[in-house]
Amino acid sequence: MRVFNTLTDKLEEFKPINDKKVGIYACGVTVYDLCHIGHARSAVVFDVIVKYLRYKGYEVKFVKNFTDIDDKIINRANKEGVSWKEIAEKYTGEYYKDMDRLGITRADIEPKATEHINEMIEIIQTLINKGYAYEIEEGQAKSVYFSVEKFPQYGKLSKKKIDELISGARVEVDERKKSPLDFALWKASKPGEPWWDSPWGKGRPGWHIECSAMSIKYLGETFDIHGGGADLIFPHHENEIAQSEAFTGKPFAKYWIHNGFVTINKEKMSKSLGNVLNIRDLLDIYDAEALRLFLLSSHYRSPIEFAHEYIKEAEATVDRVYSTIMRIEDFEKIEINDKSSIEFDKVKAMLENLKPEFEKAMDDDFNTAKALGILFEFIKEINRFMDKKPSQNKEIDFLVTAKRAIKEIGSVLNLFQRQPVDWYRDLLKVKKIAIKEEEINRLIKERTEARKNKDWKKADSIREQLLSKGIILEDKPDRTIWKVKIN
């Protein structure tokens, strides 16, 4: 199994520090606003990485934090005239609502920065004692800064050089800093800001120290995987490495994994461009499974271009999978006829290779795009096989095994786990179709009667009536089923 390590800038054989045990830390959100599709991508990527490692038999300890104190939280609280705690709690709750709908399994440990102030103070004090950090007087309290030039390996993750960073730095306002690159470990409190007592007086932690303190506490001084979005490589992850390795004298994380951006019209999402897409707004018009599939349809390191037509394509693909499962379930109910026989060596070989091929793709740096392609090719072939009307015992048994394989592979990606009927029920709601399921069933019953009485005009009229509302009818030998039309 190979993973791309941002630290070494190459694909490497994945060898955990402790054989089958894997420690993973992913940087979570700053809880000051609703999550956007970029947060969704990072959450889905690391959710699948954890699921796949567990599928492979690794014992994973997954830690994902909340930054619940930050300038953005304070600014939002001041703007709304409420406490910073209220803002943090409100948006932590909103985060869970979105993530639950996206099918994100909660991390084993989800620490909050404000619950780890003592651990941060201990690291900062050690860094001062070792000469890696220094204090700056701020009235009655002090701020503490990390001295970047004391850590010669600074820039090893982002491949940036200290001298180039210094010469490219903007005009530094604070002359008291030894270098424009030095970053805050502890900030002396300003009037009206939250604060904690510390050896440097009242203040609060800098952003970077929070993740170092929490990851070291729960995963140890050196652990396997540290991850997050590519936007965190510099300065956040670079600063984490510097302060953590200066503190422990040991390597921090063995593998650094970063997911690519979500772009809109080839531009990175940003509030200044006004192109930020909230998860909540998207889940108002699309099923969460379609959004999840869209995010997994590209390799996690590549940028992914958002467009509504791509989500619609993903929705149509999810629909095809559930329709296939529904078809298989219809064949499970048919009367066995062992006289007819269909040649199905090709599709049988595809089933035998399905899991090995899926694993081969996922073992190659979690290539979900390739893995999904393999699954969809198999589903296409299964439908061709069903077009031939299989009816022998061995053929139906094969279809049952195929369905089980689709579900098992889907479970690693948390896709295709619903009953097909629930997929359509949920689409009724998300598409805001102005007809209730009871009414659909009543009209189907009415149409069945009309067909029995050979009243084809009425039967066609009911079909058209439902179609105009976005409901498609499919007549089966023993019944009529309904589906939601995918645009």
Curated annotation (Swiss-Prot):
Binds 1 zinc ion per subunit. Keywords: Aminoacyl-tRNA synthetase, ATP-binding, Cytoplasm, Ligase, Metal-binding, Nucleotide-binding, Protein biosynthesis, Zinc. Its EC number is 6.1.1.16. Zn(2+) binds at C27, C211, H236, E240. A motif ('HIGH' region) lies at residues 29-39. ATP binds at K271. It is found in: Cytoplasm. One of its GO terms (molecular function) is zinc ion binding. A motif ('KMSKS' region) lies at residues 268-272. Its cofactor is Zn(2+). Belongs to the class-I aminoacyl-tRNA synthetase family. This is Cysteine--tRNA ligase. It comes from Thermodesulfovibrio yellowstonii (strain ATCC 51303 / DSM 11347 / YP87). The lineage of its organism: Bacteria, Pseudomonadati, Nitrospirota, Thermodesulfovibrionia, Thermodesulfovibrionales. The gene is cysS.
